[in-house]
Amino acid sequence: LHTQWPGTGKPRDPFFDQFYASQVQLMVDPVKTQDYAQKALSALLDRIGPAILLTHSQSGTFGFLVADKRPDLVKGVVTVEGGGMPRGFTPVGPPRWFEDAPPPDVTWGITSIPLTYSPTVAEARQLTFVRESMPAPGTLVRCWVQASPARQLPNLQRMPHLLVVGEASAASSTNHCVSRYLTQAGVRNTWVNLGDVGIHGNGHMMMLEKNSLEIAAFLAGWLVDNVEKGRRTTS
């Protein structure tokens, strides 16, 4: 259950109204959005130096793209409730639970603009995706992955990745497919449903919810173990 949102979650509730007032328009073209974000954030890293990337929702793909463009400057990537699948899913309920959403016009796997693959990919149509024959244990969807042999993502292999979803979020049913795509491409990553680590009741906007400090502590602990200590181990 979604129990951590403050207030009623309905209009005229002060928490909801404050949240709603913060919302702004977004660009609906993922190609332009991702291109602008990759260029701007890469330029920022060039100025400030090495960093850990923390992304959420629509910006989830930005972390992958910046890490791909500046692998020497990205020490780790934390993707909270992020997108990035070759194909999405539409919930339909039992017994099928999910159907495939319409395919995107262009996909580079987990992004809408080019990533660095090995062997090299010059055009998105060179990538071939297949649906897994069975859902992963404990899940209800058959993920879309690369046809075998899978091309690798060498730049993303150079840093650890954490993918996090809330227990009560819609992403908890499908977001593991991003992790499976990364794993197939040789990228070390950890996928966590917060409910599985004892953090319960969160939805998509977990950073605004009542237990957000508990979530922040979990993320910080993972970064210490996998970025700070990992760097010491490999140095």
Predicted regions and their residues:
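Gly/Ala-rich beta-loop-alpha elbow adjacent to hydrolase catalytic centers
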Residues: L54-G63
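A conserved short beta-strand
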Residues: D72-P91
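Short alpha-helix in the alpha/beta-hydrolase fold that links the catalytic acid
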Residues: S172-L182
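Catalytic histidine neighborhood in serine/cysteine hydrolases
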Residues: T183-G201
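Conserved acidic catalytic loop of the alpha/beta-hydrolase fold
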Residues: Q4-P6, K10-I52
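Catalytic active-site module of serine/aspartate enzymes centered on a nucleophile-bearing elbow/loop
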Residues: V197-S235
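Short beta-strand/loop motif that positions the catalytic acidic residue
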Residues: Q157, L163-V165
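Acidic catalytic loop of the alpha/beta-hydrolase fold
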Residues: P86, E167-S173
